[in-house]
Design a protein with these regions (language model features):
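Surface-exposed ligand/attachment interfaces on beta-rich extracellular proteins
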Residues: 43-50, 91-99, 178-180
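Beta-strand secondary-structure signal
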Residues: 61-65, 111-113, 151-155
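Charged, amphipathic alpha-helical segments
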Residues: 69-101
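Short linear motifs in intrinsically disordered
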Residues: 1-9, 96-107
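Mixed-charge, glycine-accented linear interaction segment located at domain edges/termini
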Residues: 124-180
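Solvent-exposed edge beta-strands and adjacent loop segments
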Residues: 1-78, 130-149
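A generic short-segment signal for beta-strand/edge and adjacent turn/coil regions
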Residues: 28-36, 78-83, 94-97, 117-125
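Acidic, glycine-rich flexible loop segments
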Residues: 98-141
């Protein structure tokens, strides 16, 4: 991925996993610090969480903290019946199944798109070729009186079918980029 952080001009991004909106991010001073907030949780509350890009070995890691939410796409599409929230007040019930999945099969594009920019204007996007959730990292927090939290890591994988310069992702118009 291009390392020139000066290309990052916006402070708020929509976060898309497999081209689906899942929330929005607040950018810090560097590309390594991103804040994350779900737009919708339930009718009674709006809560916040954290997402950060950090190095984990040779691959960057997206660490995502998601607060109690009614978004079924995150858990339904990613984990099937393995992990699922049931919203009841401030509580989340969850279940772990024995279904096995390959994280590489779940790897999808991840996109940071600036808030307030037209959906078809990709000039300032931050595009990751392959983003995958680490289901083994799912943890739960909170108590009866506070919002429950679900924390899960997302890994950014290298895509060897892309050019050597852009094998993690690119800044800018990713729709105009071809494989080298």
């Amino acid at each position: 991925m291009a390392q020139d952080a000066t290309q990052i001009q916006f402070t708020e991004y929509n976060f898309k996993y497999n081209f689906e909106d899942v929330g929005f991010l607040r950018m810090g001073v560097t590309a390594a610090e991103l804040g994350f907030r779900y737009v919708q949780v339930n009718d009674a509350a709006q809560t916040t969480g954290i997402i950060a890009i950090s190095k984990n070995g040779v691959a960057p890691t997206l660490r995502v903290e998601m607060l109690q939410t009614q978004y079924e796409t995150i858990f339904g599409n990613i984990a099937g019946d393995q992990v699922y929230p049931i919203v009841d007040g401030a509580k989340i019930a969850y279940g772990i199944g024995d279904r096995k999945v390959s994280l590489f099969e779940l790897a999808k594009p991840g996109i940071l798109h600036p808030v307030g920019v037209d959906d078809d204007d990709y000039a300032n996007d931050i595009y990751f070729h392959l983003v995958v959730p680490d289901l083994s990292s799912v943890s739960y927090g909170g108590n009866r009186d506070n919002a429950q939290t679900v924390t899960m890591n997302f890994f950014v994988l290298r895509d060897s079918t892309k050019s050597a310069d852009f094998n993690y992702g690119i800044f800018g118009d990713w729709t105009a980029t071809t494989n080298a």
